[in-house]
């Protein structure tokens, strides 16, 4: 119950792109991102440190790095345009910043899909305080 309350509070601050990212993950994987990825291992959700625990956590690490390269953009807030054609995610629009944000999210959603088979339930709701190794470089 405490986790659901925390998720509800966090959602109050979710705007634009993060909600789109949630939808993109849901469409790609069929999983509910808030319960599947929000508190997964060391890099999924807010913040990140230590060594990624598995392939799914590495998807989140790479996504964080991708956002980190977009210094002139607001990746957590900017709304972008995308569509799904067959099973492909297609980023659209004319704004280069928004398109790059979409591409970061697309890569993560596809990464999650490709690693569904190695998703480890033991890392769901993982305490970030256990992520003590040195973080790899992007």
UniProtKB/Swiss-Prot annotation:
Superkingdom, taxonomy of origin: Eukaryota
GO molecular function: calcium ion binding; calcium-dependent phospholipase A2 activity; phospholipid binding; toxin activity
Tissue specificity comment: Expressed by the venom gland.
Catalytic reactions of this protein: a 1,2-diacyl-sn-glycero-3-phosphocholine + H2O = a 1-acyl-sn-glycero-3-phosphocholine + a fatty acid + H(+)
Residues engaged in binding Ca(2+): 43, 45, 47, 64
Coiled-coil intervals: none
Function of the protein: Snake venom phospholipase A2 (PLA2) that displays edema-inducing activities, exhibits indirect hemolytic activity, and inhibits ADP-induced platelet aggregation. PLA2 catalyzes the calcium-dependent hydrolysis of the 2-acyl groups in 3-sn-phosphoglycerides.
Protein's UniProt name: Acidic phospholipase A2 2
Source species of the chain: Protobothrops mucrosquamatus
């Amino acid at each position: 119950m405490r986790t659901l309350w925390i998720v509800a509070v966090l959602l109050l601050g979710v705007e634009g792109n993060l909600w789109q990212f949630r939808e993109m993950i849901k469409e790609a994987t069929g999983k509910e991102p808030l319960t599947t990825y929000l508190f997964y291992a060391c890099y999924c959700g807010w913040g990140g440190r230590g060594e990624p625990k598995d392939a799914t956590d590495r998807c989140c690490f790479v996504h964080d790095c991708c956002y980190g390269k977009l210094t002139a953009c607001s990746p957590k807030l900017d709304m972008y345009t995308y569509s799904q054609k067959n099973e492909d995610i297609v980023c659209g629009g004319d704004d280069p910043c928004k398109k790059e944000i979409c591409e970061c999210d697309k890569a993560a959603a596809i990464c999650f899909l490709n690693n569904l088979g190695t998703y480890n339930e033991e890392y769901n709701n993982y305490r970030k305080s256990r992520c003590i190794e040195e973080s790899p470089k992007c």
